[in-house]
């Protein structure tokens, strides 16, 4: 630590506080500004684009300094948090008027990306999560906390691959890991990783602190007593939350045990490819959520996002949601609920801020309005006969006493902060009313007092006045001073007058001179009392908020079902996936022409479709719409299809699109093969697999061989598979794999122009129309013409491929050496496979010229 003796007392105070928070930017309150010093100032000036100055000296050197007005700090804090920075807020807690030396200061709060709760610093439509992990490469404990809602969950996960997929789903703003873990682990590639002391993860301490937080003897009631790794991680999260918030956390009331087996698992690549709530460009436009989310409240939109990213495999839960949506669709009942739900607002985060004791006056006003809306909402729910909706109505309840309390306490349109008062309603507290009246009506009181005293004493020259030194007084001319009543106490003698004070005026003075500051202090005390009273009701209010969010999502899904023409899917026990007139919910919304719906049939006999057809013909759309229909069914939603019958799936895999990973040193082909390997290792006979153009990132024979082998492996696994390819050779797979069938997307050519019909038809495609697509894309005509010449020659010289045989369980000899073998010249390879008796003299001559050019 710096030698403090060379510094000014104020800077000594700063260094002591900064030493306790070396990793955070310190906002150091000085009057109306938050100041930053030294390296903090330099960093903040760069990040916030504010002026860096050097004012004064301490320790013989100029002090680098940057400052921001405290009343506009929110905008700067929001920017810093978005950039991943943490900020320690250091406030003046002493009174400058009475302080000897520097005003006493202390850090009252630490704002970090994962623990921020201020409305202005959060994205209202996304969860803001804090996570911690503990374990080794075989088994990990994962704990996740949303401090803005109170949701706190744990789970144990096997292996890095599954853990990283779960972290990608959760996308925590901060991730805590033990400091004794080796450097360079896969988890450290994520943003917001913080290393914490190993003892923060101590399981015994964690168990004790968690039981203390929840008021329980043990954790058996939460179903996680034996999850020792996850409990250690949860204890670290709880300690970190308390350290940053500097207050009790009454809104953290329970621990939920999440199980991956209860969900449909999507890996990171599948989540990205399906564009559930984030598109491939990182935005929200044209995502599944952008189409299916018309929720009335932000908390419901966040719940919808959680549902989309964590589909369920619990048939009872899914069918209860379906039944609820059907009930809300009857007689358009959702239309009665949605306007009332809009009045509820973001109750979930409001209650969390109340629990953290940093709720703003407008939070309480919104809570007041929400509670006032509940009785009408309850009345509207009485006719909803679906059991799940009835359970939600019971949980929601009403809170007439709290509604009345807030209606009496908070003015209609309160200011943003309590700092300057003006929040508590007149009539709520007699003492506050009196103090405010004194402050606001001092002039009128003095005029009334003067009139009364003139009448009482009969002295017409009597005056009531005030000066800053002597305070309030009654002044009489010297000649009338002797006639002053006995209760007049002499205060000051002037040349031509005497000044007096009376007990009544003295009492008024005591009140009036401090009325404004006392009124503000009283108002703040009443506000704190109000928060404490609300905290006493936090548990049922939070349960109500959760139920309201779910009701909002279900009403939204009913509205979407009506307006997007969605229908109820049916879950069955036997293995199948039948879709009639299925549509892509997102593409359908952006098309200016009607979307071409298509069928799909997979069952015990047919487990894989090999899909061929032209580029832009709709293969990827067809595959993605299938995955989205299955996913929507697994959140309990209705689906974009005339009819859908399906069995539960355990995973959805997608290998679609191409991109490299330059930062990770992986080529496009390596990324493609990594994703393919993940699918081949983890797909089961209950999985849905989408494979698009596997093998296109390498040479033709390598790519074809890999695609062929991958398709055969998936056929043996019996996963539901849609395998789109331009390798026409793969259309012979059904001959060796009975569970495989061919379908194609049709197109036609008219006047040398391609027309995509987008219909899925049985059998393989007759041609790929690649040159027509290239022409449509604007490739120059001479290039197209030359390509036709090459195509004609290649079609003449190429030979049909036979299905490689497999005997005695051994793989057939490859037609081409593997990537790392010494390759023969392609011409020699082709020559070795030609039977001269099978080709015409003209074909032989063409081949000879072609080989001559290539050699």
From Swiss-Prot:
It comes from the Bacteria. Coiled coil: none annotated. GO terms for biological process: mismatch repair. CDD domains: ABC_MutS1. ATP binds at residues 613-620. The keyword Signal does not apply. Residues 795-816 are annotated as: Disordered. It holds the Pfam family MutS_V. The keyword Membrane does not apply. Keywords: ATP-binding, DNA damage, DNA repair, DNA-binding, Nucleotide-binding. SMART domains: MUTSac, MUTSd. Residues 796-816 have a biased composition (Polar residues). InterPro entries: DNA_mismatch_repair_MutS, DNA_mismatch_repair_MutS-lik_N, DNA_mismatch_repair_MutS/MSH, DNA_mismatch_repair_MutS_C, DNA_mismatch_repair_MutS_clamp, DNA_mismatch_repair_MutS_core, DNA_mismatch_repair_MutS_N, DNA_mismatch_repair_MutS_sf. One of its GO terms (molecular function) is ATP-dependent DNA damage sensor activity. One of its GO terms (cellular component) is cytosol. SUPFAM superfamilies: DNA repair protein MutS, domain I, DNA repair protein MutS, domain II, DNA repair protein MutS, domain III, P-loop containing nucleoside triphosphate hydrolases. Belongs to the DNA mismatch repair MutS family. This protein is involved in the repair of mismatches in DNA. It is possible that it carries out the mismatch recognition step. This protein has a weak ATPase activity. This is DNA mismatch repair protein MutS. It comes from Pseudomonas paraeruginosa (strain DSM 24068 / PA7) (Pseudomonas aeruginosa (strain PA7)). The gene is mutS.
